[in-house]
Amino acid sequence: MLAAVQPVQAAPAAAVAAAQVYLNPTAGPVGSAVTVSGTGFKVSTTGTVIVGSSTFSFKTAASGAFSTSITIPAAATGPLTITAKTSSVKASSVFTVTTSAPALPPVSTSALRFGVATAGGPLASAELDEVSQLAGESPSSVLFYKDFRQAPPITEMNAVRARGAVPLVTWEPWAWGGGLTQPAYALDRITAGDFDAYITQWGQALASWGQPVQLRFAHEMNGNWYPWAEGVNGNQSGDYVQAWRHVHDVVTATGASNVTWVWSPNVPYFGSTELAGLFPGASYVDVVALDGYNWGTSASWSSWMSPQDLFAPGIAQLRALAPGVPILIAETASAEAGGSKAQWNTDLVSYLAAQPDVVGFVWFHLQKETDWRINSSEASATAFNAALAARRAS
């Protein structure tokens, strides 16, 4: 039996691709040059790109594709529809008009320099931009933290220098998250050379980088909350000075003469370790520093402290230990609870500016144990800005 012969069906015509428009870039401020390209338009003909009330001509290729350059008009705002058309064929895409970022205020040349630490560190440029606008000046130093497992922070230091600031690197000899007892990081293990290869790597990298960097090694050593404090983690009296000198010598041997060594205890308090036994000596330190916070009534154990009450006793001890050595307030901020943070900000800058050997302060602009940020309230931000402006004018 013959099989039935089925009629041959014609293949359906290929669907014509819909016209498409592409923008590069897709966002930017007015005046931006934008490449508009398209496919699926009428072939080998002229067309028009419409941008608001402006028009730009183009010619399509034999494939129906085109590419042309346009400029975003000065009056454009927000989402801007860009349409390309050839006779009856048209397609659109949306360009987002952004506002140009305001120019950042410059770094002040005042004798009392302003620095900052932020949650995101040196690579979080938006945070640092915000601080510059809040303060009315850009920070002259940016404080950030590295533990003893991290590589030399060249990328972060480059970001700080690009802002016209000096990196203030807090180098912590422990493993973050490991707790107070970390025998591998005991001070005598550092002095014995267990970390010499790592310390040398840092020194060589800093020397090769070659630009000014402040190195704050093993800070707040007079407290009991870090494993490099004496009396914890197996550390004995005298171990801290030996470890500091060893790290200093290893780094210095690499030729890292661009490093400024910052010795930075906490403000002395009842029960803290005496500073005299922790000071490595003037030949091992370039800057002496203090960390101190006004906790106000934000904690059960704390009370409001004026800037002078907070810092004057420690500054007096630093002057006695290291006469003529510059003094830095390496971390400070105030809580809101318990008093007027706005007034505290004003008093801080006024008090520090009156101390001829205090070369700067670094504000801890973080929301952590409490809201330490400059703009924890509008009143705080306004007072901070005004205080810096007054010291610039003096």
Go through each PLM region and give its residues.
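Substrate-binding cleft of extracellular glycoside hydrolase catalytic domains
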Residues: 155-263, 384
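Aromatic-lined carbohydrate-recognition surfaces of secreted/lumenal glycan-active proteins
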Residues: 244, 248-274, 324-337, 360-366
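Acidic (Asp/Glu)-rich catalytic clusters
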Residues: 128-137, 151-169, 201-210, 278-283, ...
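Glycoside hydrolase catalytic-domain groove-lining segments
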Residues: 155-172, 287-336
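Boundary/entry segment of secreted carbohydrate-active catalytic domains
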Residues: 99-150
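Substrate-binding cleft of secreted/luminal carbohydrate-active enzymes
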Residues: 108-119, 325-394
